[in-house]
Amino acid sequence: MTGKVYLVGAGPGDSKLITMRAVELIQKADVVLYDRLVSKKIVSMIPKTAKKVYVGRSVGDDTSHQNGTNDLMVEYAKSTKHVVRLKGGDPIIFGRGGEEAEFLKSFNVKYEIVPGITSGIGSATYAGIPLTHRKYASSVVFVTGHEDPEKNEEIVKWKKLAKSVDTIVIMMGLSRLGIISK
């Protein structure tokens, strides 16, 4: 295989928070596969010479959608040099970047993971809320509020977590707020 896939974090949505490395890779891309959490302003950075492929997934979509995205990454890596898989936030903080990397590796596709600012940090910082503070919070944890529905049981033990960590950042938890807050 001659191509390489870059799993790139686009940051929390503000185009000024995307990394210089991400911009560089977007500008060199032959193909960009992007999801629904990537802002329109960042999508507009994709050069006209690159093929843009929307692979956005919505809440409730089955896993076949992700399988299709995985297949596209391999397919494009076989036929082009630079494939960018552009993901909102950071690709490996609840972004399936780890799963995508495993898939690429299983097909011997070269890949690189490029970090992005996760919304859990970016939104708190913009709001002026310190996730850690020497006087008040010595620990922080990022936890999903929406675990894989195919698991037999919930792994997150909310009551135990609430007693053991100073700051809890819950990602994708709005629809399960009633369960989480008990």
Task: Say what each PLM segment does.
Residues 1-10, 15, 20-117, 122:
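Class I S-adenosyl-L-methionine
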Residues 2-5, 110-112, 118-182:
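Beta-strand/loop-alpha-helix module characteristic of Rossmann-like adenine-cofactor folds
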